[in-house]
Curated annotation (Swiss-Prot):
SUPFAM superfamilies: EF-G C-terminal domain-like, P-loop containing nucleoside triphosphate hydrolases, Ribosomal protein S5 domain 2-like, Translation proteins
Location(s) in or outside the cell: Cytoplasm
Binding site for GTP: 17-24, 88-92, 142-145
Gene: fusA
Function as written in the Swiss-Prot or TrEMBL entry: Catalyzes the GTP-dependent ribosomal translocation step during translation elongation. During this step, the ribosome changes from the pre-translocational (PRE) to the post-translocational (POST) state as the newly formed A-site-bound peptidyl-tRNA and P-site-bound deacylated tRNA move to the P and E sites, respectively. Catalyzes the coordinated movement of the two tRNA molecules, the mRNA and conformational changes in the ribosome.
GO biological process, one term: ribosome disassembly
Domain tr-type G: 8-290
UniProt keyword list: Cytoplasm, Elongation factor, GTP-binding, Nucleotide-binding, Protein biosynthesis
Protein name, as recorded: Elongation factor G
InterPro entries per record: EFG_II, EFG_III, EFG_III/V, EFG_IV, EFG_V, EFG_V-like, EFTu-like_2, G_TR_CS
Species in which this protein is naturally found: Buchnera aphidicola subsp. Acyrthosiphon pisum (strain APS)
GO MF terms, alphabetically ordered: GTP binding; GTPase activity; guanosine tetraphosphate binding; translation elongation factor activity
Amino acid sequence: MSRTTPISRYRNIGISAHIDAGKTTTTERILFYTGINHKIGEVHDGAATMDWMEQEQERGITITSAATTTFWSGMAKQFKPHRINIIDTPGHVDFTIEVERSMRVLDGAVMVYCAVGGVQPQSETVWRQANKYNVPRIAFVNKMDRMGANFLKVVKQIKIRLGANPVPLQLAIGAEDTFVGVVDLIKMKAVHWKDSDQGVTFVYNDIPPEMIELSKKWNQNLIESAVESNEDLLEKYLNGDRLSESEIKSALRKRALNNEIVLITCGSAFKNKGVQALLDAIIEFLPAPNDIQDIKGILNDVEQTPAIRNSDDKAPFSALAFKIASDPFVGNLTFFRVYSGVVKSGDTVFNSAKSQRERFGRIVQMHANKREEIKEVYAGDIAAAIGLKDVTTGDTLCDLNDPIILERMEFPEPVISISVEPKTKVDQEKMGLALGRLAKEDPSFRVRTDQESNQTIISGMGELHLEIIIDRMKREFSVDANVGKPQVAYRETILNKVEDIEGKHIKQSGGRGQYGHVVIELFPLQPGGEGYLFVNDIKGGVIPSEYISAIDKGIQEQLKCGPLAGYPVVDIGVRLYFGSYHDVDSSELAFKLAASAAFKKGFKQAKPILLEPIMKVEVETPDDYMGDVIGDLNRRRGIIEGMKDLSISKIINACVPLSEMFGYATDLRSQTQGRASYSMEFLKYIEAPFNISKDIIERREK
């Protein structure tokens, strides 16, 4: 079976936004206008197609990235059918990992902003992630029908707060109750969508007289932005010649794909206005897979030779697994993006990250949580596979005879932990299975057993993240559990360098004995740097090379549970430079135990300290409550970094220890009568104050 849509007519896009910007509603309208949904699903009645988890429908927020495929031929049927693969991503900061991993496999993004709230805290986080992966993007200013909507104010915020170069393609005609359509700044025509058929059809009209001057000004801005990096067009423009519509669009597209400009459209998804023109902009100004740079990777060889794959069906197969999801009927679904080549159901491929073979049982195209089985997928496709046994997020799947490892995704370390205990014996068996499955799905969620208390500890990116995990355990796996109080993920490190630390493990009392002897040096590393560095400085074979890895392993085991208070040890270097061995009695175990003993001894001499996680907190509050909010942040050991003035509210930026932020959402609501909002993300680890450290260490010793 050959490809039905040429790769030049593919668009792999993500839809991203701050919570409550109307992103899921925008996606629902896209699905309606492209013909997949015959009835529009609304978020506020829990019927949205892309929000298919029960928790999402209850809370009205998007938690996981649902993927769907649809087709669009243009508002006026002016294009050949284009295939749009859409990833809908969450807007809550606890689910940033979902945004991160979808950005990794996308070619373009649509950023949705609220015409009232504008650029909000999470918008900046998502923008940084798009910058990191160099994703071209267009913006959609939504909710133009809401009280306080102001399109040009949001355009200005995109410029100032995100450091972008925004170029509006449209102007809003009216705002709030009087929002009726948009001015197309390329055609210089007013566009009105008909209410009688939910905006499926539209008409071009003359620009309202009161908007002619403003439209001319922004049309000139658009044309100047288009010709700026095209000498031929610039000369034509300066000579006073009229530029054609296709010349303007082609020049804008080139600059948008190079991330030099961000094109902006507007509308009201809820009122069925503007999403249709947004779809046209996706086709005209976002890249096809063959517009973007070739994907980089390394060959699966000793030298790790750099290699590339281009978006071509004839190239060797390569794909990236970007999400694992559990399905109640078929088990694990592995979402993957094909970068090159073709794969059919039944094919055996190579998982180069784990150096093992995998067989594609079945391949399905996803539409939210509905599946359509397909026989094969091509370069540029996003699909899900059933039957892959040992694939995890970030693994590369490739041709058996032409292996490559594509650049892996980076996942943040969890910052908050809670203990979970099953209520019954039956729950205990099911809980292990449930947590294993959930950890496989979500790389920012971790599970471990506390060595001292034997409790199961789960860790994640925030309180809401762990709440959802516990909720899913109950709903999807019928596991009832008692949940402990949130715990902070502290770390341990050292401040001083110490030398001549001796570790011995010697037992020689007849028969085969044990002999391991090491001398090491401990030294601090740059904070947030390499984490752990092992230097083998053994000269003259005083310790045989076969025991070196056992010494390294013995130290690494101690890093998991630090000598100070049992927290992981970070930013520490170990230099092994002397020791001795016995021809008969030395063993890997003896050297491992000797290294562990030396590390424990040296750590206590090297001025050990406790590190606490510091969060970057951004609070948006009405002016009236600013004093209360700042006072409360100060009481929480927060440091106010700065403030920004919005028209009706203030933004407060602060750095606050995570341990002081538990329950903050409730406190902020009561302080501001529910009118303030905040976002919080991990910033860095710093030394915890003496009194805090003392309390924690004493509690751990009891």
